[in-house]
Amino acid sequence: MNPLRRKRLLIILAILVGVGIAVGLALSALQQNINLFYTPTQIANGEAPIDTRIRAGGMVEKGSLKRSGDSLDVTFVVTDFNKAVTITYRGILPDLFREGQGIVALGKLNADGVVVADEVLAKHDEKYMPPEVTKALKDSGQSAPTPAKEG
């Protein structure tokens, strides 16, 4: 084989191997960072994977918020008005977190059907509702409740 042709072949092979490694690393990173959204109904029906990072969202049930007296542990129930799921969280809840309003929790579903959240996102004004929560409420035949005016 001609030395010039051999050199070109090695360069092309090196480029192909490099591109293959880059694509593999990119796909691996994307796979680890994908957090699929599940409604409380889907979680209760067993559609959400256990011990995999997910997003769970819905409306916080009134009267379900329980705070630990000696730690930052919080437990509350989220519903899509069909079924409900319990969420536990250790940390400070967002200022806009309220019972009766929409939230999205990021965490893992344990074997008991409880979402152990490491992040809780609250809706940030009266008009905004996460698209997934809006769709879940619409599918259940409910509409997002209008918050009471404060003041």
Curated annotation (Swiss-Prot):
Keyword terms: Cell inner membrane, Cell membrane, Cytochrome c-type biogenesis, Heme, Iron, Membrane, Metal-binding, Signal-anchor, Transmembrane, Transmembrane helix
UniProt: heme binding residues: H124, Y128
GO molecular function, one term: heme binding
Keyword rRNA processing: no
Pfam families xrefs: CcmE (PF03100)
UniProt-listed InterPro entries: CcmE, CcmE-like_sf, NA-bd_OB-fold
Periplasmic side: 30-151
Lipid bilayer topology: Single-pass type II membrane protein
Presence of the UniProt keyword Phosphoprotein in the record: no
Gene3D superfamilies: Nucleic acid-binding proteins
One example of a Gene Ontology biological process annotation: cytochrome complex assembly
Transmembrane stretches, start-end: 9-29
Cytoplasmic side: 1-8
A GO cellular-component term linked to this record: plasma membrane
Compartment(s): Cell inner membrane
NCBIfam families xrefs: PRK13254.1-1 (NF009727), PRK13254.1-3 (NF009729), PRK13254.1-5 (NF009731)
Family assignment from sequence similarity: Belongs to the CcmE/CycJ family.
Its job: Heme chaperone required for the biogenesis of c-type cytochromes. Transiently binds heme delivered by CcmC and transfers the heme to apo-cytochromes in a process facilitated by CcmF and CcmH.
UniProt-recorded name of the protein: Cytochrome c-type biogenesis protein CcmE
Annotated source species: Pseudomonas fluorescens (strain SBW25)
Lineage of source species: Bacteria, Pseudomonadati, Pseudomonadota, Gammaproteobacteria, Pseudomonadales
